[in-house]
């Protein structure tokens, strides 16, 4: 599939219509979905209506933006008016929101064509998209393997060209890890840069919506469209949004000296040797492009996973208390009384992983353990944030592997939650610190599975992050590789 800019030029020159592009995309989805299961809901009728509106604008001689007529996928934990939003959970089965999330409203205002809602781990809790109550998404590079998670549906859809770009959410790595596994670009913005209004909450102090694309430029275009202050989100930042696309230059030294820090704690035990080799070669390539390379230490990085798995479940236990079968969503057959109905609904409506995290969070917040667990985890979070602040005194951008391995087999880790949690070892600290993080392809293993390089930036320096990613991408050809889906 062509890039956003190529499709835009075809539309403006009237070489193709938005309806033609949309119909071709829907046909491609219909062909691949029996194998991939990237989408929970395909919105063909609405998509074609949106495409016709774009064609009418072009016919009337009106100018259209870069995203007008572009097929986009949206993770199914973002509210879409009149379209089911299930969070891949039985408890929200058949829930149709009466309002639009801020990010999807921005897409519609830009003329984008939403072709469907993508699969995820239930309530975004997982690293493999195996926790969905409805279906398991396959990795386009190897259908027996997972696409990562929790935004696995969005990553797989972009990799398989079922849409040009897609939206995901990232609480502990849920955009970057699937981007790594599926060989696409995925960006988690600075906390507060993109509105969370209409995003179904998992852990409110960590959740952030971000873009997936086949290229850095496509990712930058989508970020520009969704970023910005929103009075409906109390954590939204009142900042000026730069032109992320204009900042993309193939010359890494276009803005002067660039210092890149390699986080030494992300190399060593637990890291696959083939991943280490690919990331090391990527760092060497950045050096050849003119970057100064420094090895730096973030000593508290290793405590990211244990602190995250206290903070995130604690917030989830509060956020998910609203699902009781009364106001919306699925309700279990009524029991003897109201309390019985609550219990039956929650016991049968939530999946095993969601119930596990609710229990962990409830335990960590209980009166006798609050100081020992939750308060301590928040102190560790502060230490991790300080590690990053100290590192950024000496460097501009940090690098690490995105994930310790390439995509694993479906079912391989479902019986071992700890092994599954360690998939986000490299990504979680970035969320705890509220920083921007990006994953882009930097190689393949011997089985042809993609490997991701993680770039971490200073607060609100997505422009610099995208510039480094673009310079690396333009000097390599990893992003041009395409999975052969049989």
Swiss-Prot record:
PANTHER family in the cross-refs: GLUTAMYL-TRNA(GLN) AMIDOTRANSFERASE SUBUNIT A, TRANSAMIDASE
Source taxon at top rank: Bacteria
Family the entry assigns: Belongs to the amidase family. GatA subfamily.
Gene: gatA
GO cellular component, one term: glutamyl-tRNA(Gln) amidotransferase complex
Protein name: Glutamyl-tRNA(Gln) amidotransferase subunit A
EC number: 6.3.5.7
Subunit structure: Heterotrimer of A, B and C subunits.
Enzyme class label: ligase
